[in-house]
């Protein structure tokens, strides 16, 4: 749980950097297997934004930053710029979680600073790895990110890599060439669909022309009687 909780703080920071400081927490779930983070944002994130957030969190993990837990007065924490959850009720004494940019950081060198009573790691490197599983809508104006860390991230990467290798085997190509092979197959399917549509049109016209040969004139009126299958 500590791994996913500390990763949640890093994710919150990354969303502020990539989207805006209005991407504030609107709910979260921290479990031993994964994390879920809801935040305010009017539209879905682009694949590029998701990639940037994921990269930023992993860079913070690799930076091996210290995570400091301190209990202090609510007024003091607010004066220092600690981030508080909107609508949350706090007592006069609160617990703060600071992720420092280095072991020698001062108050002004905090990478992340939030009010939080949960359990956390001692250093960001203990997160191990961070991988976003999905990003989608949780409610109107609220987005949701689900992610895994540590062993969970490793296992998901292994699962996806296995799928990629199986796909490469089916396509009879190398792992690096899978995207190009898929693009080529999509182009081929698109062309085949066009050819099929053209053949259907030609067949329909040919059938119609054959039927015209059976037109009979009844009292100066051209009549065509035919049985149409289906």
Predicted feature locations:
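Feature representing long, continuous alpha-helical segments
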Residues: 5-8, 13, 17, 51, ...
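Non-catalytic interaction/regulatory segments
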Residues: 39-138
């Amino acid at each position: 749980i500590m791994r996913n909780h500390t990763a949640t703080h890093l994710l919150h920071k990354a969303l502020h950097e990539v989207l805006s400081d209005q991407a504030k927490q609107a709910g979260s779930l921290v479990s031993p297997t994964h994390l879920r983070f809801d935040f305010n944002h009017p539209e879905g994130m682009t694949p590029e934004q998701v990639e940037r957030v994921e990269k930023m969190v992993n860079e913070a993990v690799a930076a091996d930053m210290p995570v400091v837990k301190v209990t202090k007065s609510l007024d003091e924490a607010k004066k220092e710029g600690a981030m508080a959850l909107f609508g949350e009720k706090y007592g006069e004494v609160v617990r703060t979680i600071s992720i420092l940019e280095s072991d020698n950081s001062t108050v002004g060198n905090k990478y992340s600073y939030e009010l939080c009573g949960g359990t956390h790691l001692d250093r960001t490197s203990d997160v191990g790895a961070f991988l976003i599983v999905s990003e989608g809508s949780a409610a109107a104006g609220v987005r949701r990110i689900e992610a895994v860390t540590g062993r969970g991230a490793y296992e998901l990467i292994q699962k996806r890599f296995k799928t990629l290798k199986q796909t490469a085997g089916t396509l009879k190509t190398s792992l690096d060439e899978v995207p190009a092979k898929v693009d080529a197959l999509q182009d081929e399917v698109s062309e085949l669909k066009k050819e099929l549509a053209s053949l259907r049109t030609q067949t329909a016209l040919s059938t119609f022309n054959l039927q015209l040969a059976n037109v009979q004139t009844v009292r100066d009126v051209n009549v065509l009687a035919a049985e149409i299958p289906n």
